[in-house]
């Protein structure tokens, strides 16, 4: 069975989305990134939070809008929600809880990664002991407010081990393993 990975681009002050979930800031940091390009080929399924699924898209208004990794990845997607849409969405399975979502995504991913998208879903995976790796692409910008990479008020320390550190002109990539 593959591993569970949370990947996100984050501002230097710790935000993955701006105020109100705004993702437009991300556009200028989406240049070529060999670390992400390599990762995309190793993703077998996505586990997506409902707010991420229904939220802002850095590719809004383009042909890449609504496509994971700007159209760079296709495959099974599992969205955590208590309110699935009435009309089915092709390629997307809506699940009502984390355990069933993780089980379905892991089965679909096989030996590849289940890539988690969404801060709240990543936090839930971490708290459940299901998160294995974290890839943070750190952008050289300060957003000042928004959605944090991890929001864990009153949470305990979680030890991480640095697996790799790479960079592009746009971002610095930090790949971490959750130490158990």
Language model regions located:
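Enzymes that bind and transform nitrogen-containing heteroaromatic metabolites
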Residues: 1-180
């Amino acid at each position: 069975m593959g591993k569970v990975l949370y990947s996100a681009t984050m501002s230097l002050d710790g935000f993955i989305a701006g105020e109100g979930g705004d993702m437009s800031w991300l556009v200028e940091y989406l240049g070529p990134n060999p670390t992400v390009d390599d990762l995309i080929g190793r993703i077998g399924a996505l586990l997506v939070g409902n707010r991420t699924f229904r939220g802002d898209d850095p590719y809004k208004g383009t042909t890449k809008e609504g496509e994971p990794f700007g159209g760079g990845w296709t495959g099974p997607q599992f969205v955590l929600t208590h309110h699935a849409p009435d009309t089915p969405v092709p390629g997307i399975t809506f699940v009502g809880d984390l355990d069933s979502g993780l089980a379905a995504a892991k089965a679909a991913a096989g030996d590849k990664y289940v890539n988690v998208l969404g801060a709240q879903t990543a936090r839930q995976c971490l708290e459940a002991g299901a998160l294995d790796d974290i890839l943070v692409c750190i952008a050289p910008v300060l957003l000042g407010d928004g959605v944090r990479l991890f929001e864990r008020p009153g949470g305990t320390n979680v030890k991480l081990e640095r697996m790799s550190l790479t960079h592009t002109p746009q971002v610095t990539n930090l790949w971490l393993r959750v130490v158990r």
